[in-house]
């Protein structure tokens, strides 16, 4: 059987505003980019009666048997879209869990993209949106991933042009509970990103934006406050922002050299934290 290898890229929120709450869910708007940090997924058609999913790698511990990939496969089976074909999926996890980088969501999105591109399933654009939303709110962002603005009404505006930032991604040895962080949000921002324009991704604009979830996360976890303060104090840092609901903190640079130097300084200061250099793609 042929095996296919695909990359499942991490996403980061360059800015995030919580603009309100409707029933149990919060309305957010966000500036989103993908970065070259990725999980590696191998897909093999199988003769077995059940799909097999195997997570390996540094960040593969404690992933539930009911995960984004198993949910996707179950939906596709229930809709009889896979024509009774079964697959063995192996995921090497390089993206940390509970980091605000959508690792699990992007795994499901990457797999759905693969099935569509290889014509293993035939669905309309609207169906891929419905399937994505059944799995998780972030999944839709990974369907044909690109620079994007998520608007508070749920619409997504995508851009073909790329932005060029070198980034340091740091994460302490704990994750943040998305549910907890959102539950403590007690004030809302006015929408800022409508109409959506590419110029919002320029450093001069980004510097003055925020992630509304930082206030809650940094109060709950003083270590995140320490990380952000330290990164802000490094030379050539353009701005520093938490991604999603944390716990990853991202520092942005124009040059690879400055980013590399910052990363080595960070590792000396916080030697038990995870820290990598990456770039927007």
Curated annotation (Swiss-Prot):
UniProt-listed Enzyme Commission number(s): 2.7.1.148
UniProt key word Protein biosynthesis: no
Root EC class: transferase
Chain coiled-coil ranges: none
Enzyme active site: 11, 138
Function summary: Catalyzes the phosphorylation of the position 2 hydroxy group of 4-diphosphocytidyl-2C-methyl-D-erythritol.
Family: Belongs to the GHMP kinase family. IspE subfamily.
Protein name: 4-diphosphocytidyl-2-C-methyl-D-erythritol kinase
């Amino acid at each position: 059987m042929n095996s296919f290898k695909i990359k499942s890229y991490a996403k980061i929120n360059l800015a995030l505003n919580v603009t309100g709450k409707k029933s149990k869910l919060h309305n957010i708007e966000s500036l989103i980019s993908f970065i070259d940090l990725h999980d590696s997924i191998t897909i093999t058609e199988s003769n077995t009666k059940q799909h097999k999913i195997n997570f390996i790698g540094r960040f593969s511990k404690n992933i539930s048997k009911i995960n984004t990939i198993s949910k996707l496969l179950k939906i596709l089976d229930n809709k009889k879209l896979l024509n009774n074909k079964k697959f063995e999926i192996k995921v090497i996890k390089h993206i940390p869990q509970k980091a605000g980088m959508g690792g699990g969501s992007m795994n499901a999105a990457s797999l759905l993209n693969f099935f569509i591109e290889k014509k293993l399933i035939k669905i309309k654009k609207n169906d891929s949106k419905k399937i994505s939303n059944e799995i998780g709110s972030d999944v839709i962002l990974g369907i044909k991933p690109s620079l994007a603005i998520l608007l508070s009404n749920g619409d997504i505006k995508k851009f073909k042009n790329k932005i060029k930032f070198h980034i340091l991604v740091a994460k302490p040895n704990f994750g943040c509970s998305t549910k907890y962080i959102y539950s403590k949000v007690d004030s809302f921002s006015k929408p800022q990103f409508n109409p959506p324009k590419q110029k919002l991704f320029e450093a001069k604009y980004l510097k003055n934006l925020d992630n509304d979830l930082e206030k809650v996360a940094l109060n709950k976890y003083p270590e995140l406050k320490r990380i952000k303060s330290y990164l802000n104090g490094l030379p050539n840092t353009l701005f520093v922002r938490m991604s999603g609901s944390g716990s990853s903190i991202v520092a942005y640079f124009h040059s690879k050299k400055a980013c590399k130097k910052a990363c080595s300084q960070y590792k000396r200061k916080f030697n038990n934290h995870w820290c990598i250099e990456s770039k927007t793609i």
